[in-house]
């Protein structure tokens, strides 16, 4: 039972990070901003 819960949690995490479906627009907007600011890009990478 614990494994099932773990799998579901992991799947949700992977979907949010790996699946660029919903977070696609956000990532795009962030990417553009990051591209404009090289320093911010480094910070974002560290934050992630």
Swiss-Prot record:
A single BP term in Gene Ontology: sporulation resulting in formation of a cellular spore
InterPro entries linked to this entry: SASP_SspP
Region entry Disordered, spans: 1-48
Bias-annotated ranges (Basic and acidic residues): 1-12
Record localization: Spore core
This protein's UniProt keywords: Sporulation
Factors inducing expression: Expressed only in the forespore compartment of sporulating cells.
NCBIfam families, per the entry: PRK09399.1
HAMAP family the UniProt entry points to: SspP (MF_00666)
Similarity annotation: Belongs to the SspP family.
Record-given protein name: Small, acid-soluble spore protein P
The organism of origin for this protein: Geobacillus thermodenitrificans (strain NG80-2)
Gene: sspP
